[in-house]
Amino acid sequence: MRLLTRPAPAAPEVRRPAGVPHWLPSAPCTPGHCLAGTHAEVGLPRRVARCATGIAVVAVGLALAPLVRCCRPALRGRLTRAWARAVPAAFGVRVRIRVSGAAGRLPTGGVLVVANHISWLDIPLVAAVRPARMLAKSEVASWPVLGALVSRGGTLFIERDRLRSLPATVARIASVLRAGGPVVVFPEGSTWCGRRHGRFRPAVFQAALDAGVAVQPVLIRYRLQGADPATAAAFVGEDTLLASLLRVTAARGLVAEVTVLPPIPSGAHPDRRSLARAAQRAVTGPPSGPQDRHGPGPQDRGVSGVN
């Protein structure tokens, strides 16, 4: 086991990149500041094995996606959840999925699933809880591997730099929800390192109000062998997908904790801002009495297209 040690630099000055519209969400998290620290690493052979296994699992999922879509909904859901749990496990991440005592059964039918956003791993982690269509920025479609994966999953894309396209996107989400389909959104609109959270943007919550469906909050946390929140899985700032992948496969004892929190009835809130605040409080606050559901198993880098 090798111990990686880097001094943590001073907090970065938050600057919005030139030419980026002021309404686009951004986070102060950067690789140089948030990813510095000390964590144990596995040896090179295990890293190579993890990379190869992870890429193989993703490739199998891409190849079988057309066949899985032809299956009955119940079987399709089981296969998708099993594959989604296998992806992080293949990259060396232990997965723990929990359901808060008050949450009861996992959601079915039309529901707006909202989660905090830290890493590209968030995508399969949420799918392991509830397979659903996802809202993502249009740039994700061109990402290597991940782009093809989310595109085949029926992702709803949005051009974030075109503010006028937002109402149409909200209407599309509401249409999917009315038809009984779940939709996943990362309402922070950008990835954060996991030690802090961003504000939940209210726009997409209008879709839940229009469709009359509940909001399902999900909390995602990454830890190293039960320690405080770890940033090894974070995909922030000017980080590249390759650098993030290599960091994940090198980490020893990385655990992803996914907690399903009690659903929030949209009708209990007068407007989207109130609903967004309620969802944010649920996610950023400590979960109440979670129970195990499954065993182990400033440049925006998020996938979300939320404004």
Model region roles, listed by residue range:
Residues 145-147, 162, 195-270, 278:
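A cross-family acyltransferase "interaction/gating" segment
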Residues 118-172:
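Membrane-embedded segments
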Residues 1-37, 96-101, 123, 202-203, ...:
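Soluble, non-transmembrane catalytic domains of enzymes that act on hydrophobic metabolites at membranes
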Residues 176-205:
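Catalytic-site beta-strand/loop segments enriched in glycine and acidic/polar residues
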Residues 2-4, 66-128, 136, 295-300, ...:
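N-terminal signal-anchor transmembrane helix
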Residues 109-115, 155, 181-187:
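Generic beta-sheet signal
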Residues 33-96, 148-153:
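A transmembrane-helix-recognition feature enriched in membrane-embedded lipid enzymes
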